[in-house]
Amino acid sequence: MTVNEFYKQKFGRKVYKISLDAGCTCPNRDGTKSYSGCIFCGQNGSGDFIPFQENIRLQVENAKKIVENKIKNGKYIAYFQNFTNTYGDIEILYEKWNQALSCEDIAGIAIGTRPDCIDSQVLEKLSILSEKTFVQLELGLQTSSDKTGFLINRQFFSSEYLKAVSILKKNVPRVHVVTHIIFGLPFEDEKQMLSSVKFAIDAKTDGIKIASLYVLKNTVLEKMYLEKKFSLLSREKYFSIVEKALKIIPENVVIHRLTGDGPKSQTIAPLWIFDKKQNLSIINEILKNK
């Protein structure tokens, strides 16, 4: 099931995600686990497109204006995307989540975080929220390989992801859990990439996001790439692996994304990720034959 089909089924109309910035940091950046972050992560985390503003309601309204021509009579998911959005003062975070939910036409909330940042306080707030609205929690697994996890400076074990999904399923069953996976991480072969997908499926993730690795300026990954320590996936190879991945993803797991990109001005490679028309055409063909 595609995410558009899932949202249409749940809300009865078109739903568009708008990205917000809660001003969070990450235990992999503030010194709790590391100061450098994951080797592929830009200075603004995954929210490179989001201009930071303290006022959440203002962020929502500005984001809606950007996409309002694309969505008629639709609703929005408020997506707290940047860095680790369950890491910090939970009362402050909870207030920001509710500020977004109080805005007009917001159908639910999506929260991006790490598997090692789900504690009892977070579970309590997620439980309260999920009783009154749709809640989507997005976990950045990236790979099931701890060897690769160490290389990319992920700073958590894959077993911590399994534990996180388990406690989410047990304590907040209404929450829709989405798992992020990256294809093309340094030195991973096709078998490992597909193993990461199966790992998430076996953990009972509700949804999955897959993207090809891209290199941003001023990252450790950029240095590795320029020194030719690894190769990036070609478009053909990437979508070949995606097609195989879709064969092992069951129908009840929602496919939230099959490609992704960073800010063009900050991206070194691969440039094919910006050819969205061609990429979407390939994705539609793959899904049609699934």
Model region roles, listed by residue range:
Residues 44-63, 67-90, 105-118, 134-161, ...:
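Core AdoMet radical
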Residues 38, 99-106, 195-209, 278-290:
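Structural recognition of alpha->loop->beta junctions
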Residues 159-220, 236-259:
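Conserved C-terminal portion of the radical SAM core fold
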Residues 67-71, 96-104, 124-134, 166-170, ...:
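Acidic (Asp/Glu)-rich catalytic clusters
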Residues 16-20, 76-79, 109-111, 135-139, ...:
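Hydrophobic faces of well-ordered beta-strands that scaffold small-molecule active sites
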Residues 60-64, 94-98, 123-127, 162-166, ...:
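Generic structural signal for well-ordered alpha-helices
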Residues 1-77:
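N-terminal [4Fe-4S]-dependent radical SAM core
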Residues 1-5, 14-16, 207, 214-290:
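Auxiliary Fe-S-binding modules of radical SAM enzymes
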